[in-house]
Design a protein with these regions (language model features):
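Bacterial N-terminal signal peptides that target proteins for export
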Residues: 1-10
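C-terminal cell-surface anchoring/sorting signal
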Residues: 2-3, 17-18, 22
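Bacterial N-terminal signal peptides
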Residues: 9-19
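Gly/Pro-rich, tryptophan- and cysteine-flecked surface segments typical
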Residues: 22-197
């Protein structure tokens, strides 16, 4: 009887251990309304217009929020990052050319890439994208896209940023990459907050 109880106890402990290992292997997911992604194209191409990114705080949080902005080239390397305050019901407008890609880490202007925005609580000075980012839902964003030239014109389209699920690992990676960009760039790699709000 004692041996049967010991065997059952070992089986229960093994199953619990497997459950803990399995649970820890799952990525920790954060609120689904905190992470927005979109792309830009034909940036800085001669004759092409400038694209814009617009971010609004709908006011549902009853306070200021940070738009933590991370700009990547088409080779998946972070080129610029910045944190920008957004007040309730405020609208912030970024020029892709002047605000998001004019100060690249390596000195080469990115023609095509993507923009990731984390909606976050105000942290430091007032918005620091490289550390202590606490995702907080609500920001909305739209971006214009400069399409490939048709005849003599570059067609422009606009889309809402897509909501994506932000994992704790992705948030940690964004902050670490931005920290690296800020420290290595000696002033390069820091985007600017555009106009408005």
């Amino acid at each position: 009887m004692m041996q049967k109880s010991l065997t059952i106890a070992l089986i229960v402990v093994s199953i619990c251990a497997l459950g803990v290992i399995s649970a820890s292997a799952q990525p920790q997911l954060l609120d689904p309304d905190v992470f927005k992604v979109n792309y830009f194209s034909n940036n800085g191409v001669s004759g092409a217009p400038d694209a814009t990114v617009r971010v609004t705080n709908p006011g549902t949080s009853n306070g200021n929020l940070c738009a933590m902005v991370y700009v990547f080239d088409n080779d998946q390397q972070m080129d610029e990052c910045c944190g920008c305050i957004t007040t309730p019901d405020g609208l912030r407008t970024f020029s892709v050319t002047k605000d998001l890609t004019s100060n690249p880490l390596v000195g080469i202007v990115v023609k095509t890439g993507d923009v990731k925005i984390v909606s976050a609580a105000v942290n430091n000075s007032p918005c620091e994208p490289s550390a202590n980012v606490t995702p907080y839902p609500s920001l909305r964003a739209w971006g214009t896209h400069i399409q490939n030239k048709v005849g003599s014109a570059y067609p422009i389209t606009e889309t809402e940023f897509q909501a994506a699920t932000l994992s704790a690992g992705e948030l940690s990676s964004l902050q670490a990459d931005c920290y690296f960009v800020e420290r290595l760039g000696s002033g390069h790699g820091i985007c600017s907050c555009g106009t408005g709000d």
